[in-house]
Amino acid sequence: MIKVGVLGANGKMGTQTVATITAAADLELVAALDLGDSIETLKKSGAEVVVDFTHPDSVMANLEYAINNGINVVVGTTGFDSAKLAKVKELLAKNPKVGALIAPNFGLGAVLMMQFAAQAAKHFESVEIIELHHPNKADAPSGTATRTAELITDARKVANRPPMPDATTSALPGARGAKVGDVAIHSVRLRGLVAHQEVILGDQGETLSIRHDSIDRTGFMPVVLLGIRKVESHPGLTFGLENFLDL
């Protein structure tokens, strides 16, 4: 029985995670914390793994507490840049038995979409990303879109692809999206959406679209459970769920 704590327990992802952990026969929910609750409860409750679905502004402090107290972490909060990842590695180096999984997306289809897009990008002249989310999402572009763009940029470098052609002059700032690596990302925020992403690849005479749609947050839960069950056996930092899957 793995003892699990959840941070951001009252949020949309946190609420679903709490319900899923409670229903799992091999997991025990020992702490469900949200804004205003004491993080010390994690240690007092004996949590072995903590799942963080909080906010980019608070996730680093949560990680520091958990890692320094020997608690493995599964993080779905986005907003991790190279500086934050370096800080996490530094914390883990001082606590080498602790595992930390940071995942831009917990949807199996989303992970596969990122991998497929990176493979396809080696063979197409151009690629852009459109990510679509509900208007309460805290960040833009999404962590999934950022990670996808990084994987595509790396894949294109390995394949020695030339720069993407673009002779457009933008009449308004941001009209061509935000660049991550070589890839333009366009962020849409609309009521009624959950989490969606389309990668559009183009070359002479054809285009290829790779799209993933999260219709309901229950779709994330099987891979959240996978992370909880596997993180302890993967000490150090694991960035991206593809490292826990047979891809």
Segments from the language model and where they lie:
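Hydrophobic beta-strand scaffold residues
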Residues: L29, V73-V74, G99-I102
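Short glycine-/small-residue-rich Rossmann-like dinucleotide-binding loops
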Residues: T54-H55, T78, R189
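Glycine-rich phosphate-binding loop at the start of an alpha helix
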Residues: P56, M60, S82, M114, ...
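Rossmann-fold NAD(P)-binding glycine/threonine-rich loop
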Residues: E64, T77-A100, F116-A118
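Rossmann-fold NAD(P) dinucleotide-binding segment
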Residues: K43, V49, D57-G76, L85, ...
